[in-house]
Design a protein with these regions (language model features):
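Insoluble glucan recognition modules
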Residues: 1-276
Length: 276
């Protein structure tokens, strides 16, 4: 992508190949000297978009919002030129990408692993929850079906209950959580585990490294922000407040905890609350 930016600065259009002449200039203070030797570099620019939409939505009969343009499903933008959405799609029905949730929007569609501009439409073979990642700078897209999201309890080294998809980019589930008694106290560390339909997995943990529980932090606090994390048992985890220890010998016997993982916001986050 760096060479792609160099090609753009040199005036090459998307997908075009050109040969550039480059050299080195050294400077110190106000003085600069250009090297006498130069080299040639041939670059083929990636097939991307010159004008990247400021926002992106999914609309169509396959989407959660249906054909109503005002109910188009908004995508998040985790990085410059990139968009992403977790959403349910109906198999055999169609959807497209638009730059605003209104009639007359600019339209894009997915063709294989490429993003195309124009009045095309896209389908998925089966109904399911999908993660769609789009990079407009190189016109590429990855579509993966999410089979499940689970609460991962670090002391057990395992997922203990599932968070079903409930719509609008949110996974939500509830169960009793029993902190694990250790010699030093009760262990309450956790993160999340996402499994894709192909069997691959992705852990989701804290975006802001922490080794404490949230205390009185509000649900909007950055403490709860989530991000993709490495495949391991202990790193980048959170800690639950004592009120969520529903074990018979815990702080709140019988407590049922409700957890929501939320992907429909700029900073992906999660919410923990008592269900009962």
């Amino acid at each position: 992508k760096t060479l792609n930016k160099v090609g753009a600065a040199a005036g090459l259009n998307s997908g075009e190949t050109g040969t550039l002449v480059w050299t080195v200039m050294a400077s110190r203070g106000l003085n600069s000297v250009m090297a006498k030797e130069s080299k040639k570099l041939t670059i083929t620019r990636l097939v991307g978009f010159e004008e990247i939409p400021a926002q992106l939505y999914l609309t169509g009969s396959a989407t959660e919002g249906g054909m109503d343009a005002s109910k188009a499903v908004a995508c998040a933008s985790p990085e410059k030129d990139k968009f992403e959405v977790f959403t349910k799609l109906e198999g055999g029905k169609t959807y497209k990408l638009v730059d605003r949730a209104a009639e007359g929007a600019k339209v894009f569609y997915i063709n294989g692993n490429k993003i195309m501009e124009g009045e095309g439409e896209t389908t998925v073979e089966k109904t399911g929850v999908y993660r769609i990642e789009m990079d407009f700078s190189i016109a590429s897209v990855t579509v993966r079906e999410v089979s499940k999201m689970e609460f991962y309890f670090c002391p057990s080294g395992a997922a203990t209950f599932e968070l079903p998809y409930v719509g609008n980019g949110v996974f939500c589930g509830q169960d009793k959580i029993e902190f694990k008694q250790e010699g030093w106290g009760r262990d309450q560390r956790y993160k999340f585990l996402m499994t894709y339909a192909d069997g691959s997995i992705q852990y989701w943990g804290t975006k802001n490294t922490t080794d404490s529980n949230p205390g009185a932090a509000t649900p909007e606090d950055p403490y709860f922000y989530i991000m993709e994390t490495p495949d391991n048992q202990w790193d980048q985890k959170w800690k639950l407040n004592n009120e969520f220890d529903g074990a018979a010998d815990g702080y709140n016997p019988g407590a049922i905890t409700k957890i929501s993982v939320i992907f429909n916001v700029e900073n992906y986050t999660h919410k923990v609350e008592l269900a009962n």
